Curated annotation (Swiss-Prot):
The N-terminus is blocked. 3'-phosphoadenylyl sulfate binds at residues 49-54, 131, 139, 194, 228-233, 258-260. Its EC number is 2.8.2.4. Inhibited by estradiol. Belongs to the sulfotransferase 1 family. This is Sulfotransferase 1E1. Sulfotransferase that utilizes 3'-phospho-5'-adenylyl sulfate (PAPS) as sulfonate donor to catalyze the sulfate conjugation of estradiol and estrone. Is a key enzyme in estrogen homeostasis, the sulfation of estrogens leads to their inactivation. Also sulfates dehydroepiandrosterone (DHEA), pregnenolone, (24S)-hydroxycholesteroland xenobiotic compounds like ethinylestradiol, equalenin, diethyl stilbesterol and 1-naphthol at significantly lower efficiency. Does not sulfonate cortisol, testosterone and dopamine. May play a role in gut microbiota-host metabolic interaction. One of its GO terms (biological process) is 3'-phosphoadenosine 5'-phosphosulfate metabolic process. The active site is at 109 (proton acceptor). Changing residue 264 to A: Decreased of sulfotransferase activity. The lineage of its organism: Eukaryota, Metazoa, Chordata, Craniata, Vertebrata. It comes from Cavia porcellus (Guinea pig). It is an enzyme of class 2 (transferase). One of its GO terms (cellular component) is nuclear membrane.
């Protein structure tokens, strides 16, 4: 039997096709599954808290050919709709996307096997951004604290245990990143590391420009780097999620743009927690060629 705190924890989530997912998303799943992709759609896929907003803004700037004003006209969650996001009140990713002109940029946290079939049929390009598990766990913990429809995550070590067992929305980080990594041999899929973007943003921006078939210029790259720096995005209402009401995202508890660094896990993991995490990590990632850096 579940104790009351465990019952509270699962109030908003349910097991769905092998992962934990928000009940509201599951309720409207048929609309996601039936979604019709267009050949020029671009999918940005990532496990939550891996740098999705950052790479989305970089891509928006590439599409806008460096026009900052154009990118500031609307919130990132309207420019890059969140495919499977749906609730009874105000959010409907599928509807947003259906009403959008091409080319569309589409955000998802789904693993490849749950992505609507039409994306594969239409041979859409996809960008997957991946971040080291420890920093993701830290960021996810703070996300739980500040976003509505999330239970109390408990203490940080308690939350990390849930994270390790895949008992968080979108399930196991390990399964998620391994499944996208296996897909990345496909030339239509670009796999990008958060840590590489932190270390050499110019190199990664150029990689993205080439992947998207655009012409690079020094001026364009400079504009993108400036506009998508952490400080710029933290202060930009169109990227920092302050356009969402406080009852959805309470940034007084923790800002959406919190630190934007690699290695913040060192400020949260005790030696013992780190040791057990590393042991579990090695078991989960055994046999995978995917290598991530926990610091730069």
């Amino acid at each position: 039997m579940m104790d009351s705190s465990e019952h509270d924890y699962y109030e908003y989530f349910d097991e769905f096709r092998g992962i934990l997912l928000y009940k509201q998303f599951i309720k409207y799943w048929d609309n996601v599954e039936a979604f019709q992709a267009r050949p020029d759609d671009l999918v940005i896929a990532a496990y939550p808290k891996s740098g999705t907003t950052w790479i989305s803004e970089v891509v928006c700037m590439i599409y806008a050919e460096g026009d900052v004003k154009k990118c500031r006209q609307d919130a990132i969650f309207n420019r890059v709709p969140f495919l499977e996001c749906r609730n009874d009140k105000m959010m409907n990713g599928v509807k947003q996307l259906e009403e959008m002109n091409s080319p569309r940029i589409i955000k998802t946290h789904l693993p490849p096997r749950l992505l609507p079939a039409s994306f594969w049929e239409k041979r859409c390009k996809m960008i997957c951004i991946c971040r080291n598990a420890k920093d993701v766990a830290v960021s996810y913990y703070y996300f739980f604290l500040m976003v509505a429809n999330h239970p109390d995550p408990g203490s940080f070590p308690e939350f990390v245990e849930k994270f390790m067992q895949g008992q968080v929305p979108y399930g196991s980080w390990y399964d998620h990143v391994k499944s996208w990594w296996e897909k990345s041999t496909d030339p239509r899929i670009l796999f990008i590391f958060y840590e590489d973007m932190k270390e050499d943003i110019r190199k990664e921006v150029l990689k993205l420009i080439h992947f998207l078939g655009r012409k690079p210029s020094e001026e364009l790259v400079d504009k993108i780097i400036k506009h998508t720096s952490f400080q710029e995005m933290k202060n930009n209402p169109s990227t920092n999620y302050t356009m969402l009401p406080e009852e959805i995202m309470n940034q007084k508890v923790s800002p959406f743009m919190r630190k934007g660094i690699s290695g913040d896990w060192k400020n949260h993991f005790t030696v013992a927690l780190n040791e057990s995490f590393d042991k579990h990590y090695q078991q989960q990632m055994k046999g995978s060629t995917l290598q991530l850096r926990t610091e730069i």
